[in-house]
Amino acid sequence: MRMDKLTSRFQQALADAQSLAVGRDHNIIEPVHVLAALLDQSGGSTRPLLSQSGVNVPALRERLGEALDTLPKVSGQEGNLSIGNDLNRLLNQTDKLAQQHGDAFIASEWFVLAAADDASPLGVALRAAGGDKKKIEAAIDKLRGGETVQSENAEEQRQALEKYTIDLTARAESGKLDPVIGRDEEIRRTIQVLQRRTKNNPVLIGEPGVGKTAIVEGLAQRIINGEVPEGLRGKRVLSLDMGALIAGAKFRGEFEERLKAVLSDLSKNEGQIILFIDELHTMVGAGKADGAMDAGNMLKPALARGELHCIGATTLDEYRKYIEKDAALERRFQKVFVGEPTVEDTIAILRGLKERYAVHHGVEITDPAIVAAATLSNRYITDRQLPDKAIDLMDEAASRIRMEIDSKPEELDRLERRLIQLKIQREMLKKEKDEASRQRLADLESDIDKLEREFSDLNEVWKSEKAALQGTTKIKEQIEHAKLELEAAQRRQDYAKMSEIQYGVLPQLEKQMLLANEVEHHDFKLVQDRVTAEEIAEVVSRWTGIPVNKMLEGERDKLLRMEDELHRRVVGQEEAIKVVSDAVRRSRAGLSDPNRPSGSFLFLGPTGVGKTELCKALADFLFDSTEAMIRIDMSEFMEKHSVSRLIGAPPGYVGYEEGGYLTEAVRRRPYSLILLDEVEKAHADVFNILLQVLDDGRLTDGQGRTVDFRNTVIVMTSNLGSHQIQELSGDGSAEAYTQMKAAVMGVVQAHFRPEFINRLDDIVVFHPLDKAQIKSIARIQLQGLEKRLAERGLKLDLDDPALELLGNVGFDPVYGARPLKRAIQSQVENPLAQQILSGQYTSGDTVRVRTEGGHLAFTKG
């Protein structure tokens, strides 16, 4: 017999049989070796073939193992291995059967058929396990589908649909698919296209996360429930697994062979199968090599003839990029656009899915949580689509509650740690012999006893609460399972089973659920199993950094005292602080316009009066860190071409992939303070970009992504009108301020365009600083020096006359507070540094600073 006339699978089985014989010290290869190798072959057709013909495969494998154990073993042989007479005879019989059926290559199924009525131990074992020649022959005919074996790889291509597709209708029948709520219009349109005579192939196009795959799952569920037109009843929806199709296709033509086998199996089923290709664009170019045909081109003839009933799904961008370029492929599909559902539709979808997620996590999901998931995700998570982002929110919030139930409560954990500390102390005190130690040990023992009792009581409470929650989870799972069984019985029209479930099993389970809920209605002390709107808000805050969760009392008080907090760092400038504080309070109370930034201001004033310092203080107040402020020095954007640095370079330019300086910063931290410093120095084109941000709270970057600025506070600083401010500042009265602001606005209107000024929430003019304010600033700035000295173990004691002197030296009405910093450096820091280095002060000393003859004098305190 020529080995090259065997199929590759049969050749592999013979090689495995040889290895099996060598491993067991057999010097003759028998038929049992070959069948054992065929049964153990991964992806082979022998095991499913025998199962279909009614053979008990595990029992057969066991009998083969016993037969192998009885074969004689040979030790010390020199590798002489031969084919036994029984195997030789069976192989000849296999060859004969293959020729009778017109096969060019000998397939492994003929070996199984030849063994069915053979007198060898293999035949006996096969018949004992339920093997019947006629049944095996019928199973072979069904497996081959009337085709002959004409290629070496013919066995690889069998059962292509089972290997390379996932049966969605079977999954829907077994209740493994999530329910699909709404989307009736899209499903109806898909069915309409599928009912056409030719080009009956819909392609679902929509943004990622809008539910394209869910529509096909909904169609599969409708087919199972018989809620489709006559033309689609009884059809199967199979999802093509592109990963399985491509994986392991090592040689050229292997991928095409697999795809051809799938198409061949589909055409045999004569329109009874609808093929779903998720990520349809992957078919274009798949398997493409020099001169080879890609998968998209192989599909075209089958699509055009109507042999292939297909549903595709892809995103808008990928459809444009891949499918539209291939006009011949595009015209064979009918577009069905899937839009993003509204917030109301999303709430309905979440209500339908709620039970599945509640059972999976073993928690209760409240209706306010569902409404919050839809509304908050729509408002704050702008770079993703509904309903996907809302489902993710609900899922993560439920996961968080489940994790808290499973892990030890904080109170118990704290008690346990305290107990460990006390027990360590007890062991140390046991080694001491003095009376005081014995007394402390006795006190410690009583503390440990008290804590252990408290810990034990709490632990019991936690365990009982946890057990109560787990009980309801189990009942929920049983109810879910009973409902699935009821649906299956309804489809089979098994009225006895339906009656048993509907009037027996379900009411009993619901009664148990009611009793369990009554136990749960007592407020649990340590665990919580309800997902509420607060949990959803907490997850949104963690995702985006935007504080949308319910404000704690402490935070409310902090916001009401915001002006006082800012005045600790910024001296004077009442109007500016009031305007900024009001904007933040509006935003946190949820009253600000949801389609504009939380606040947009232009700060005007001479240099050194606190414009930038107020922004730093605000960032520190909001985020507890000045690092959270996005600071952009607008003097860097004086040229026209530098505008692209803010939003990213356009396509074709260097740096296109990197994104913009402003847009990337806001995408990473959507809740932030943006400081555009020295804004008048920027090129006029920068303001064209800012118009969109100030009006709509959004900006499109160089890559076409929309960046959300609605949760930012935008502050621009400028020195415009400084001369007028110095001249007209007057006595600080309201009239003088109004007159000064009018003069400054004249300068501002001459520099900025009306459409830019009109979009700002407020223009704030800062006052020049007077001597009293400079003195207060000196006190604030010296606090930084005190901190640095404290790190070295030194204290600073500076009296009022010394502070007055510093204020006088550092006062300059033109330059504001900046000369004060230089005055502190020259008058205090420089002489103090010399004295510390010379060893005059050591750790623990106090540095006294006093005035002597118009100068500052330093003494050790």
UniProtKB/Swiss-Prot annotation:
SUPFAM superfamilies: Double Clp-N motif, P-loop containing nucleoside triphosphate hydrolases. Residues 6-71 are annotated as: Repeat 1. ATP 1 binds at G206, E207, P208, G209, V210, G211, K212, T213. Keywords: ATP-binding, Chaperone, Coiled coil, Cytoplasm, Nucleotide-binding, Repeat, Stress response. Residues 159-340 are annotated as: NBD1. Residues 555-768 are annotated as: NBD2. One of its GO terms (biological process) is protein refolding. SMART domains: AAA, ClpB_D2-small. Residues 769-861 are annotated as: C-terminal. One of its GO terms (molecular function) is ATP binding. Signal peptide: none annotated. Residues 391-523 form a coiled coil. Residues 341-545 are annotated as: Linker. Residues 83-146 are annotated as: Repeat 2. The keyword Membrane does not apply. Residues 3-146 form the Clp R domain. GO terms for cellular component: cytoplasm. Its main location: cytoplasm. PROSITE patterns: CLP_R (PS51903), CLPAB_1 (PS00870), CLPAB_2 (PS00871). Part of a stress-induced multi-chaperone system, it is involved in the recovery of the cell from heat-induced damage, in cooperation with DnaK, DnaJ and GrpE. Acts before DnaK, in the processing of protein aggregates. Protein binding stimulates the ATPase activity; ATP hydrolysis unfolds the denatured protein aggregates, which probably helps expose new hydrophobic binding sites on the surface of ClpB-bound aggregates, contributing to the solubilization and refolding of denatured protein aggregates by DnaK. The Clp repeat (R) domain probably functions as a substrate-discriminating domain, recruiting aggregated proteins to the ClpB hexamer and/or stabilizing bound proteins. The NBD2 domain is responsible for oligomerization, whereas the NBD1 domain stabilizes the hexamer probably in an ATP-dependent manner. The movement of the coiled-coil domain is essential for ClpB ability to rescue proteins from an aggregated state, probably by pulling apart large aggregated proteins, which are bound between the coiled-coils motifs of adjacent ClpB subunits in the functional hexamer. Homohexamer. The oligomerization is ATP-dependent. This is Chaperone protein ClpB. It comes from Xanthomonas campestris pv. campestris (strain ATCC 33913 / DSM 3586 / NCPPB 528 / LMG 568 / P 25).
